[in-house]
């Protein structure tokens, strides 16, 4: 599809059929039927914690020892084992070698835990065997370690079990956040006065990311670019909307499922497979097709944006949680809440401004990045912690890093700076938690929210309860550690409109 300077979604979609209407229960039923004798659990390696924002009531791990997987595989909600487990790897903040090592460790430990569970089941007289599927969850704007991460997962599975991956299904779409794929091209939807318009993702600020920049919006060409030609664009299987919607709006979803499975029949040796997605029904049609392909014997891995898992397991869209639901089962404290803003993308800066403008009772504490990187950083952080703790006694605190992003031409150096800043934020959060626990914690930005969860709040196991806004921004309930009982809000840097951060804060605050 040619890329034009100005595109309208309605015009682009006019070339394709209408969506196939598919209830979530249809997908859940297909999954249940195939898992009757051998339950399948998706292990989602989430390169930052914002991948959970589209799902609800699933276990989340920030550590991945075999014992952690054993807890997750056995955790039951309403008496049933869950269909997916999220593992917060935080690999988007790591260099390639570190990211590969972490992916391998997670996969090996997950497979070991599944073997232990299968052995225990057989010993108890049951015949069921846990099957694992693996999902590499990454950014809906195409940033992250691709193809390194799916390559590593596939190689580890082959080394441990001998199973060879036939195809890697690439689905970055996130319609709730305005990211859609049409005709094999990935777009961002316009907002406000630009509503209805589409911008190819390579023309956005995200394509200029210091660590993970890219030049192509057409996913087949993106694959060729990122694989340095190992996968040619013309070798990529494209599941466009003609295939995803083959059944038509009133047709049998099985028609679409068969068309999808037929289209990827030739996949072998980790063939890249990209999929068009515009609506939730498209996710469900794709899920049925992938289930059919796997039933036929195809071995697939997934490289996806946040909502893919919801569609793949047939989970209903969870309505946005209220403030009362966020505190359900826990008595909120009278202290202020802590809003931590680390992301530097444009939408986050606008959201921060809107929150500061509207929340006049909040105290603003800034971590100056230049001051942090030079001089007495320890003494500087002592003062920051003191300011935060004192302010929490009577107000919400907005803790943010200075908005001037320090960039270099060296991707590794950019990551090092990002990690130094994140470590400082984590130290402030952790010392605050142990001195004067806040009413709630919101973390804005992927790397920020990951480090705040695992190190600042010392969360090891959590349950994602659902979104705070429709389809975006997830609430985690820590089930252990010093943050147990404190609502933790994971807020991606690149989602929401200018008012979203203020809206979430207003739901949780007692002073806003």
Identify the residue ranges that each predicted region occupies.
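Cap/lid and interdomain-hinge subdomains that line or gate substrate/regulatory clefts
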Residues: 36-41, 46, 72, 81-83, ...
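A structural-propensity feature for long, helix-poor, extended segments
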Residues: 78-91, 392-393, 475-512
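A glycine- and small/hydrophobic-rich beta-loop-beta segment
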Residues: 325-427
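Extended C-terminal subregions enriched in glycine
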Residues: 416-447, 452-454
């Amino acid at each position: 599809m040619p890329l034009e300077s100005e595109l309208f979604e309605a015009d682009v979609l006019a070339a394709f059929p209408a969506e196939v209407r598919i209830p979530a229960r249809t997908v859940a039923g297909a999954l249940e039927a195939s898992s009757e004798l051998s339950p399948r659990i998706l292990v989602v390696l989430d390169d930052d914690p914002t991948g959970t924002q589209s799902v609800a009531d699933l276990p989340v791990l920030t550590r991945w020892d075999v014992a952690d997987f054993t807890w997750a595989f056995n955790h039951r909600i309403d008496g049933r084992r869950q269909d997916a487990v999220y593992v917060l790897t935080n690999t988007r903040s790591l260099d390639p070698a570190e990211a590969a090592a972490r992916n391998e460790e997670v996969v090996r430990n997950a497979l070991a835990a599944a073997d232990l569970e299968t052995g225990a089941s057989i010993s108890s007289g049951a015949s069921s065997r846990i099957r694992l599927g693996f999902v590499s969850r990454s950014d809906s704007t195409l940033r992250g370690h691709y193809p390194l991460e799916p390559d590593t997962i596939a190689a580890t599975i082959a080394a441990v079990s001998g199973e060879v991956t036939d195809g890697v299904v690439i689905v970055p779409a996130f319609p709730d956040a305005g990211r859609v794929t049409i005709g094999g091209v990935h777009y961002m939807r316009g907002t406000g006065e630009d509503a209805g318009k589409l911008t190819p993702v390579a023309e956005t600020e995200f394509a200029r990311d210091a660590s993970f920049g890219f030049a192509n919006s057409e996913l087949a060409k993106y694959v060729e670019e990122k694989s340095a030609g190992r996968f040619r664009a013309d070798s990529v299987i494209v599941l466009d909307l003609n295939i995803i919607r083959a059944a038509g709006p009133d047709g049998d979803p099985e028609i679409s499922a068969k068309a999808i499975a037929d289209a990827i029949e030739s996949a072998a040796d980790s063939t890249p497979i990209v999929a068009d997605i515009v609506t939730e029904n498209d996710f469900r049609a794709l899920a049925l097709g992938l289930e059919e392909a796997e039933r036929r014997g195809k071995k697939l891995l997934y490289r996806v944006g946040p909502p893919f898992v919801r569609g793949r397991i047939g989970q209903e869209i969870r309505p946005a949680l209220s403030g009362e639901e966020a505190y359900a089962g826990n008595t909120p404290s009278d202290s202020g809440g802590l809003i931590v803003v680390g992301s530097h993308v444009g939408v986050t800066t606008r959201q921060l401004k809107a929150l500061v403008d509207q929340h006049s009772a909040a105290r603003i504490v800034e971590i100056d990045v230049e001051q942090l990187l030079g001089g007495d950083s320890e003494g500087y952080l002592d003062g920051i912690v003191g300011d935060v703790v004192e302010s929490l006694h009577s107000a919400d605190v907005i803790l943010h890093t200075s908005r001037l992003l320090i960039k270099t031409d060296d991707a590794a150096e950019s990551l090092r700076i990002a990690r130094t800043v994140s470590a400082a934020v984590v130290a402030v959060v952790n010392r605050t938690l142990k001195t004067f626990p806040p009413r709630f914690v919101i973390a804005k930005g992927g790397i920020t929210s990951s480090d705040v969860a695992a190190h600042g709040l010392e969360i090891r196991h959590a349950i994602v309860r659902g979104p705070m806004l429709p389809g975006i921004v997830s609430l985690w309930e820590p089930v252990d550690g010093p943050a147990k009982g404190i609502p933790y809000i994971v807020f991606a840097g690149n989602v929401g409109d200018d008012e979203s951060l203020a809206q979430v804060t207003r739901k949780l605050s007692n002073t806003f």
